[in-house]
Amino acid sequence: MENDQEQPQQEMEQEQVDIELSSLQGQERIEYINTLIADSYNIAIAKKLEEFLDIQINENIYLFQANSTLLKLYQFNPTHLNKDSIAKMLAKALMNFPCNDFLFLSYMIPSIIQKEEPLLKLFILNNFLETCKFKEAWSHINSHSFFSEIPSFIDNIRNFISGVLSITYQNISITMLGELLNLSDRTQLVEYIQSKQPTWKISDSTVSLQSDNSKQKKADTFTFDQLSRILPTFIK
Amino acid sequence: MSQTNNAGISNTNQNNNRKGGNNKNYQNRNNQQQGGQQHQGGQQQGGQQQHQHRNKHQNQQGQQQGQQQNKQGRGKTPLNVESFPINLSQQQVQQLQAFQQQSQQNQSAQFQSNFLPPATALYTPVINYFINLYNNFKSQSHQDILVSYDSFFKSCETYYPHCALPTIENLIPILGDKFEESSFTDRFFVLLYKEIYYRYYYALVFQPNINTCVESWQNYYQIFHTLLSANSPNDVEIDLPNAWLWDLVDEFVYQYHTFAKFKLKKQDVDFLSENPEIWDTTNVIRYLYYIIKKSQIFSANTNRFESSSEDFCSHPVYKMLGYYSVISLVRVQCLLGDYTLALKTLELIDMGKKAMYTYVTACHITLYYYLGFAYLMSRKYNEATKALNTILVSVASKSKSQNFQSDHNEKKTDKMYALLTICQALYPNKIDENVSNNLKEKFGDKLLRLQKGDLTVYEELYTFAAPRCIGPVPPYISGFNVTALDPHRLQLSLFLEEVKQQSLLTTIRSYITLYSTISIQKLAGLLQIDPEDLRVKLTCYKHKLFNVLGKGETKWNNQLDIDFYIDQDMIHIDNRLYAKETDSFINSILKFEGSLTPSYNWM
């Protein structure tokens, strides 16, 4: 019985695994990866997913499901475990902060590997970012070339930090902002702030991080939803 | 324990000798009883048996022991009931002797924890219940099957408290001519009885010996293959109540979980390396997948020209089995630490109020337990709170039915209260008043200590409440040593890491609730920490909150929480507790409107 079902499936899978990743582009490639990971317990797809992970790094795209499937395959087939790939997918997960991708992956990585390089540096950085110790995070990033070698890694981390600062601060001194974003060069910093306009504005030595709209208190405003609940009462 | 056990066995032996019954004898008796009144007969016997049960405790057992065992629901075998000895096979006799020797020699529970002696006698009530079960099974009436299913289990608990159930080979002769080897239904009944046999075995021993595990696995293999190889739903002439179907799938995953937690001996490892398919994670998941696929519950009504009775999802057994397999799959995914996948799988299930998971209480509880746990591990504390609150409200409103599962359900409920306590400490949220009171009763003192950031209490509650996570491959294959790979400890340490990262946040929360504005300097002074550290903590607070609420949600709909922002060196606090005027006005309007409306209608 089992053979009846499995045989054609396996043949189909074999065909799928044979497709060259480099022959596909954009959406087509994503769709292909999605069909691959639908059968998530087939170790034969691991090589393709590793390849796709490199593509994600080089082309700065991201598909969490593909990476977590790869990790799962390692979990089920420990002999295939590739620490460098895990390091890469963790780096991609950090780039997707504040989503919890890093956390989800770490539940499936044996703790002994977490405490060793090449993964240790990623877990240290994760801890700094999670606790918002941004200055420490930057000095850690700067002391490991691994991070700067990943395209857009630094930009993404900076964007994450900007996001957290935006929801925390209304106004912040420009020097402090520079430190937290690791932009010590004034012109670079100003350029960065300008890229965030109109939400961010410089005025003298402080930067306003929240747009005027969100400053308004929500407490004294009605939404139509709220109002519509009581409308019938007034109509009577 | 072992002494009572021993006594029980020797007593029953004596009893048997006195009666001097043999196989023929009990068949005769059966035939007499089969005249349409079995059900009633069974019930009478049940009542009688209970009575004897009580007598027994008073007369023959030490009072204390009796009470203790009564509490556990597993008294000693009542003796004043007619019984017939079972002709044990050579192997069973050896097992029995070995067991008796062992329990005489050493009092340690070691031997007993993985082995049950075979049943030595058949008791009349059990026989009656068994026949009932068989007849009802043939009649395919849900209600009747369920009643006899429950009462069969109950009678087994009374008569076989410390040994395995009689094997199906012992029981088939009872059915006499009614049983037909060639009938699909009868063959399937045999498989189902065996499943009950192993389930009973697993319920009584902590870690069954490997032979039992293998046999049970093979039995599941047979059940699933019988169901999966059917060409048309019409070929499968069986019907089973939902509770039984749920027990079947649930037990399958339970046994897998038990097996994965095993500490294997050298000879077991040798055996398993030659038979890697036994209780293998991939196989377990694959079976669940196949059942879901076969059941067509998620793919029906698409390209249909054929009559709908050809769909497997029109067959209640397939439909519910498929549905329960989804829930069990979620459980396996949680046990393996893949919470994203678990939550994704759950999206398949309609979570409406009248959803199918409510049919069986144990299923309802299991689903929400893993849902709550997956949310907790995903740091979605408000979602976890919502889920746990919902199920605990519903559990509290249900009347407490006494069946053999209620014990299990109660334990799960306690665990869910513990999980909810953790959520409340990390992210206070409004919960049902009743639930809140129960929670305070059970874990009130713990909650206070959690709020103070006591890590040991977090660890204690987590260890109590969380399912024991497992790795998909046993250590002898993965090559990691056991302590290095312990997946359960990994989950725990990551959870505690998060708690550590949140430390001080609750304290900060309690302070800023008191102010509408406060300078960073001043608050740092109150908390006795460095102002720079406080800035980091405040940013962290915002980050963690964002984490909880998720990307999509921008609204602060949590009434108990506060929002703040920093303007250079000042913290501005927007206290939600006092800023709900709009809502409270609207709610009062609606309330008054509501209390006025009925009088209109009456006029």
Name what the model sees in each region.
Chain A
Residues M1-Y62, F76-K236:
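Charged, E/D/K/R/S-rich low-complexity terminal regions of large eukaryotic assembly subunits
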